[in-house]
Amino acid sequence: PWGFEIYSLLTRWNPLNIRSPLPKPASGRKVLVAGLGPAGFTLAHYLLNEGHAVVGIDGLKIEPLEAELSGVTPEGRRVPFQPVRDVRTLYEDLNDRVMAGFGGGAEYGITVRWNKNFLKVIRLLLERRANFALYGGVRFGGTLTVDDAMAMGFDHIALCMGAGKPTVLDIPNGLARGVRTASDF
């Protein structure tokens, strides 16, 4: 019991990291992470531990989680969350699971060999952090531009948007049967 909460603690406190076992104090810097696939959610984790405020956006609609679980209402207000006694209560049967929009290629691209229930775990680890906000349905370069982000006070923008359009190599058999591009997944 309480394995999720212990794991959550260890993402913020690492006694084996002698130089920086705890998250750093607030830096005052605000970072926009565009794209919440594996690169985006991993970068967000490290930026939070460096003391930065992080806003993650993704072009996909991200379904809200229950406020009792995430600590965030659908309107974005922070509320107390209930601790998770057994991580299995977070899991859904993968045959019945509906895509929630969070996770980029890990949500829609990685094969069934990877347990996509882990995306909810990753999302909760981020969303429960006070200096993290998450917005779906926001396309960087369309809905939100660089100028918009700078006007909103972001100090940095991290582009973690993955492979939206494949690069087709101009070589013989570049698209032969069996050759796949990132967007195929």
PLM segments and residue spans:
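Beta1-alpha1 glycine-rich phosphate/pyrophosphate-binding loop at the start
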Residues: 33-142, 147, 167-174
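FAD-binding core/adjacent interface of flavoenzyme oxidoreductases
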Residues: 1-32, 136-185
